[in-house]
C-alpha cells in the first residue's frame, strides 16, 4: 500500500508527525506533501490558478512542503511529486474538531475532497481539544479506525471525516451527521495596538450530530459528499416550478 499524507496545519505540525507514525501500521511507502505554513480554513481553495508560482521544497526522499493550500498539495503530489498513485490519502491529524459548518471551512476536509475527486479513498482525521491538545485518543484509536474503514470501503465520491473526542474515556464509535452550529453566535472584535482587530467567534451547537456524540465521548465517523446537490429539492422544483420558469427565455 502507498499512502499520501497531507494536512492544513502545516508541514511541521505535531498532528502530521503523529499521522506518519500511524500510517506506518499500514504502508511501507509513505509520502508527505503538506503546506509550508498553517493554512487552516483554506477549505478546498487553490492558490495555483492565481499565483505566478508555487514553491516545492524537498525535505527527504518522500517528504515535501508546498507554498500552497492543502488542495494544492494533493494536486502537486499526484501530478508532480509522486511517481505512483496512492492507495489512500490521509489528512490531519487536525488540531481541533471538524464538525458542523467547520467542514465547509476546513482545509483538512478540502484536501481529502481533492483526493476523492480523483477516485482515491481519502480520510480526514481530527483531534478535539479544550485548553490543551492531547493526542492520546488519536494515537490509540486511529490505527483501528483506519483499518476498519479500509476493510469495509465506501463510494468513491465520498470522504470520511473522523473526529476523536477529548474525553478521558472513549465510549465507542458512532456514525453521525456533521451537526449544526448557530451561525449567529457571538462574534467579538478586540482592537489591537496597531489598529488591527482580533476576532473571537463563539458558536453554540443546535441540534444533534457529531458534535453531541463527541461531547459524550464517542469517536465519530461522518461520510461527506463531494456533490452538494440537494436532490430532493431539485426534483421538487423540477415538478412544481417548471411552468413558472418556462417563459423566461421566450
Curated annotation (Swiss-Prot):
Pfam family name, one: SurE
Similarity comment: family membership: Belongs to the SurE nucleotidase family.
Keywords: Cytoplasm, Hydrolase, Metal-binding, Nucleotide-binding
Cofactor note (record): Binds 1 divalent metal cation per subunit.
Gene this chain is encoded by: surE
Keyword Heme: no
Principal cellular location given in the protein's record: cytoplasm
Highest taxon listed in the record's lineage: Bacteria
Catalytic activity entry: a ribonucleoside 5'-phosphate + H2O = a ribonucleoside + phosphate
PANTHER family per the UniProt record, alphabetical: 5'-NUCLEOTIDASE SURE, 5'_3'-NUCLEOTIDASE SURE
Gene Ontology annotations for the cellular component aspect, listed alphabetically: cytoplasm
Location(s), subcellular: Cytoplasm
Lineage: Bacteria, Pseudomonadati, Pseudomonadota, Alphaproteobacteria, Rickettsiales
Gene source species: Wolbachia sp. subsp. Drosophila simulans (strain wRi)
Record protein name field: 5'-nucleotidase SurE
Record EC number: 3.1.3.5
Gene3D superfamilies the record matches: Survival protein SurE-like phosphatase/nucleotidase
InterPro entries found in the cross-reference section: SurE, SurE-like_Pase/nucleotidase, SurE-like_sf
